[in-house]
Swiss-Prot record:
GO CC annotation: cytosolic large ribosomal subunit
Annotated region described as Disordered, given as residue ranges: 1-21
Compositionally biased intervals (Basic residues): 1-16
Pfam family for this entry, one: Ribosomal_L35p
NCBIfam families, alphabetized: rpmI_bact (TIGR00001)
Entry protein name: Large ribosomal subunit protein bL35
Length: 65
């Protein structure tokens, strides 16, 4: 059976944390900030962890993580 290839787009978007989680950055941060409040923009700057439901799927796509 051939080796499973790493999904390159996913490998660039997720990083492993020290405790074993997956770090991701938030969506809606590239443009159209005039429609968002200052609080929304501030919260969008922070990274977040991948939810437990998505963790298994992403881990399978990115074999090196």
């Amino acid at each position: 059976m051939p080796k499973q290839k790493t999904h390159r787009a996913s490998a660039k978007r997720f990083k492993r944390t020290g405790s074993g989680g997956l770090k991701r950055f938030r969506a809606f941060t590239s443009h159209r900030f005039h429609g968002k409040t200052k609080k929304q923009r501030r919260h969008l700057r922070k990274a977040d962890l991948v939810s437990s439901g998505d963790f298994k799927r992403i881990k399978a796509m990115v074999t090196g993580l």
